[in-house]
């Protein structure tokens, strides 16, 4: 997966890895205003669980991809194609990623509002 993505994204540590690796999206954010959060939210529109964001803290705009050892080659190839599509979207239509996810039940929440005014209980609907 790392080898398929390193032509598109900057790999933070270009070393042999067992299964996890870290991408730095610092250049993508600087040149196209697309953050690691935007790419992670874009993953949701393709049915992929977003990777770990902003960790490790020493890598700017970090995305840590760590597929499990049970993933098939086909699913890893599919994930690579999705990350490549997200990269191309970042270059050609960054606003689409700023609004992602758009195909999910819940779209992108206002994270500042959620942090400042958390709703800590769930109101169940009466059947």
Please give the residue ranges for each predicted region.
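Non-catalytic terminal extensions of PLP-dependent enzymes
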Residues: 1-127
């Amino acid at each position: 997966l790392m080898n398929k993505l390193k032509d598109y994204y900057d790999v933070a540590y270009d070393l042999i890895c067992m299964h996890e690796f870290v991408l730095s999206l610092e250049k993508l954010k600087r040149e196209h205003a697309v953050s690691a959060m935007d790419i992670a939210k874009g993953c949701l529109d393709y049915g992929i669980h977003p990777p770990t964001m902003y960790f490790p803290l020493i890598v700017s705009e970090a995305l840590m991809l760590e597929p499990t050892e049970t993933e098939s080659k086909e699913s890893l190839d599919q994930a690579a194609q999705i990350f490549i599509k997200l990269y191309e979207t970042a270059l050609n239509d960054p606003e689409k990623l700023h609004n992602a996810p758009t195909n999910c039940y819940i779209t992108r929440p206002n994270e500042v509002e959620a942090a400042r005014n958390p709703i800590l209980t769930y109101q169940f609907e009466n059947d």
